[in-house]
């Protein structure tokens, strides 16, 4: 089973993912937690450079990189599935859809980037008011986190997704 937590920046996805993992493990269930983007991989490091202004890419390129980052971990996802683990995702495919559409890209093009990756069985969208999410992180914001108007559009996109 794949359970994904989605939502805008600073919505609590990381916190909720960790809490669910602890709860499931206390019930003696096998779990595996993934966070995307995964900044530990080569492509993830390039995404981090982009998000912090060290690289510039057109929207199509960054969304290809975000999808490639998920593909980098595809074998790990498959291993976790084969071990009957509950897979918990802090962001996954849906983030690329919402952010990509907000960046002016077409839904069908974005969906094709992840074709073949396992789909989530349950997607939980965390909806936090923009004012609160901005209050949660005041420093070291990335490219998307700094832009209040973009953040508002992302929130609207997740509401449509839900």
Give the positions of each predicted feature.
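Walker A/P-loop
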Residues: 14
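Hydrophobic anchor at the beta1->P-loop junction of P-loop NTPases
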Residues: 3-5
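The start of beta-strands in P-loop NTPase/AAA+ ATPase cores
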Residues: 1, 85-86, 122
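Hydrophobic alpha-helical packing residues
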Residues: 20, 24-25
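P-loop (Walker A) phosphate-binding loop of NTP-binding proteins
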Residues: 8
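A glycine- and Lys/Arg-enriched "phosphate-lid" helix/loop adjacent to the NTP-binding pocket
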Residues: 96-157
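ATP-dependent small-molecule kinase phosphotransfer cores
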Residues: 29-115
């Amino acid at each position: 089973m794949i359970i994904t937590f989605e939502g805008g920046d600073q919505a609590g996805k990381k916190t909720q993912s960790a809490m669910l993992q602890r709860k499931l493990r206390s019930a003696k269930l096998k779990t595996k937690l993934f966070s995307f983007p995964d900044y530990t991989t080569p492509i993830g490091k390039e995404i981090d450079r982009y998000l912090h202004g060290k690289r510039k890419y057109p929207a199509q390129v960054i969304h290809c990189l975000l999808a490639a980052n998920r593909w980098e971990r595809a074998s790990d996802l498959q291993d976790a599935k084969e071990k009957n683990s509950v897979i918990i995702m802090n962001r996954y495919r849906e983030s690329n859809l919402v952010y990509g559409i907000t960046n002016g890209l077409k839904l069908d093009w974005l969906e094709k980037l992840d074709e073949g990756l396992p789909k989530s069985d349950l997607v939980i969208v965390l909806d936090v008011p923009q004012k609160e999410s901005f209050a949660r992180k005041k420093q070291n914001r990335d490219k998307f986190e700094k832009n209040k108007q973009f953040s508002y559009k992302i929130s609207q996109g997740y509401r449509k997704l839900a």
